[in-house]
Amino acid sequence: MNYLLTYALYILILSVLMGISTWKLFKKLGYSPLVAFVPFYNYFIVLKETKHPKWWVVLAYFPIVGTIMMTIFHLFLMKKFGRDSIGQKLLTIVLPFIYMAVVNYSSDVRVIKDYDEDDRKETVLGSLTYAVVFATLVHTFSFQPFGIPTGSMERTLLVGDFLFVNKLSYGYRMPMRPLALPFLQGTIWDTGEKGNPKDDPKSYVEAVKLPYWRLPGWDNVQRNDIVVFNYPDDSVHVSIDRKDSYVKRAVAVAGDVLEIKGGKLFINGKPEEVMGDAEMQQSYDVAASSPLDIPSLYKYLGFLPVVERGQNTKGEYIYYFSGLTSQLVEEIKQIPEVISVTPKIQEKGVKDVAHYLNLEASKREGIYVESKKINYSSSIFPFNKDWNKDWYGPLRIPKKGDVITLTQENLPEYRTLITKYEGNILEYKGGAVYINGEKTDKYTVKQDYYFMMGDNRDASLDSRYFGFVPETHIVGKPMFTWMSVEGLFSNDQSHYQANGKKLRFDRMFKATNTGNADKASYWWLAVILLTLFFGWEYFVKFFKKKKEED
């Protein structure tokens, strides 16, 4: 069932519930009881009778924000019939159609006098509601705030950067779980290490679901774009749009052939094009004749995740830096105590395999002990290849329309694509492949895919581990950094942390996806948004008063 038809069905159900629970109230207002059953028009009458802006009705059935607006409209209607106490408001919010039905079928219900101007004067609650609705509209339908808690894109994007993500440029993806709390991605809160993440309270209603549908955009994901997408291996959330959001660089797009040789990335047989704003990082071992003053190093070079390895047999002090740019490497080499700076490159032919933690053994031994169970989400993709993060491929990125010849050898590469991403049933039995019960050795790809990698190449969980990112999972393009706070998130891969919290003003309201080293400033946009946010009601009242005076 397509998106619009499914959504129309939900609107019809809500309209029937509205009609059943309020038709007598509409009759008391002087309208036909049938009006209560008519989508949009029923709420239009509520706004008209309660003397509120009638254009608000267009928001009644919007995904996410519609829940807020309908609740507000229900409160208006109940107030019109004298149900305005705190308890009655709570019942209207929590049990809307049940409580309104109780009022509807009560014998003593009557219409109260029209609102006085004093009754509708601005309150803290009213201002808060306006702010929530405005922010929800922006967050849901155009620019979504996104914070960076990890260092996979260092130093192109920094831990503590907060971005505005343009959800329109690649085509707006309509919400797939329209009944949800605003501003929350997947869960309301984390129940902790002992709890199963799948049992955490969700911020959305899973039962109310809509199919995938993307509106046309004005751009496609280009090679080297920085992209926000939903993490494909998120097993906690079924809905695509509720999976965790990741930000990486699209190093390869549909149809490209990717290969990594000795830590160097090649696309279609050529060395990758490094964008002007990209600061690629790799991991290094640094040997020093005496202990390094890491806190002082931070003052000159900024925060660098580092782990002390102790002394080697030569008496040298070894430090593991999980991410250094080529420029930082040269600066560290100039430190008098530094003896050598050696890149950490994995051996060719050694497969990257991750195992789950053996919790009981780790507690008993007091150290990290791996179990025998393989963590496929953090192991190399595809699992049947002897690849690792530094020696990878060649791998072709699937493109819409590609006809794949399926073999036992390449099934691990395409199984998730065929089943999870494109909704088919795949079986391998008797030496043959069956898709949806039919024997075949061919499959036609239904959508484009992308290969995402972090600029901090050795500290990034990316497509080398979770595989292709389908078009359905694309959220949008980061537009600019609206705030940046150093030290906001701790780095569990470092023995040292940033010294306190401080704003990085030089990064605020700067473009994040231009490909140029010199970032454009968006302070002008910040001024416009703040003026709209805080000044909307003021301007509305000002022009309304002027109109009345004229």
Model-predicted segments: where are they?
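Membrane-cytosol interface at the C-terminal ends of transmembrane alpha helices
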Residues: L12-I112, S142
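N-terminal low-hydrophobic presequence detector
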Residues: N2, M18, L59-A60, A252, ...
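Feature marks short, highly hydrophobic, charge-poor N-terminal signal-anchor/signal peptide-like helices
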Residues: M1-L9
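Extended hydrophobic leader/signal-anchor segments used for secretion and membrane insertion
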Residues: D114-D550
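Short, flexible segments with low predicted structural confidence
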Residues: L9-Y10, L17-M18, L125-T129
